[in-house]
UniProtKB/Swiss-Prot annotation:
Organism classification: Viruses, Varidnaviria, Bamfordvirae, Preplasmiviricota, Tectiliviricetes
UniProt-listed GO biological process terms: lysis of host organelle involved in viral entry into host cell; microtubule-dependent intracellular transport of viral material towards nucleus; viral release from host cell
Region (Binds to importin alpha/beta, involved in hexon nuclear import): 256-266
Family note: Belongs to the adenoviridae protein VI family.
Protein name in UniProt: Pre-protein VI
Further facts: All late proteins expressed from the major late promoter are produced by alternative splicing and alternative polyadenylation of the same gene giving rise to non-overlapping ORFs. A leader sequence is present in the N-terminus of all these mRNAs and is recognized by the viral shutoff protein to provide expression although conventional translation via ribosome scanning from the cap has been shut off in the host cell.
Induction / repression: Expressed in the late phase of the viral replicative cycle.
Renumbered residue ranges of the record's region Involved in endosomal membrane lysis: 36-53
Chain segments carrying region Disordered: 105-175
Residue interval(s) of motif Nuclear export signal: 67-76, 247-258
Sorted UniProt keywords: Capsid protein, Cytoplasmic inwards viral transport, Disulfide bond, Host cytoplasm, Host nucleus, Host-virus interaction, Late protein, Microtubular inwards viral transport, Phosphoprotein, Ubl conjugation, Viral capsid assembly, Viral penetration into host cytoplasm, Viral penetration via lysis of host organellar membrane, Viral release from host cell, Virion, Virus entry into host cell
Bias type Basic and acidic residues, positions: 146-155
Propeptide position ranges: 1-33
Source organism: Human adenovirus F serotype 41 (HAdV-41)
Pfam families according to UniProt: MCPVI
Amino acid sequence: MEDINFASLAPRHGSRPFMGTWNEIGTSQLNGGAFSWSSLWSGIKNFGSSIKSFGNKAWNSNTGQMLRDKLKDQNFQQKVVDGLASGINGVVDIANQALQNQINQRLENSRQPPVALKQRPTPEPEEVEVEEKLPPLETAPPLPSKGEKRPRPELEETLVVESREPPSYEQALKEGASYPMTRPIGSMARPVYGKEKTPVTLELPPPAPTVPPMPTPTLGTNVPRLAAPTVAVATPARRVRGANWQSTLNSIVGLGVKSLKRRRCY
């Protein structure tokens, strides 16, 4: 049978197993035991008494005495009293300002009319009709009817435009075709191509020669055949090769030098 460590099952005091007597289980000596208020109060009293004794020692020491003398020289107590008094006066002033603001607001609300009076519509001013005599209107002259003409004033100028009729066809042929002019005004116009009045003709190329029609062949007659026209064919001129080694090499034709491969063992 294997050995079993029963110490892991025992109650613990921190990380150490508690293997002593069992009558102290449930008291304040173990973790999770009963809480003692008397021990807490005694600890607080001891802490307060230690602070008091330390303060008395510091106050009665030479350093404390020098500090008290310095505070008396600077009138520290009077400054503290003045500060407290100024703070109290400031609080009182703030309260007075808040009270005065509330009083002013209530007075303004009492002076304003109620809401019912605001909703009432204000009476509109009455309209009074006043008759005024206007000057007579100027009557416009009557417009002439469509059939009647408008009378002309005495001092009215009439613009007359004279237009020349184009010449007749026969007259234009007699005069001949005119050359284009350089200016549109008659006195300043000059012909472009000369002063002679010659008719303009259209030069056309001469007509192509016509081929006479061939007679229709009949039985027993030989049909003459037309000879084909001779056509000149241009042949390229041969290059004259110079008598040098390059032309000689170019004229050589053949397979070149014959070569023979032989394997020999030594």
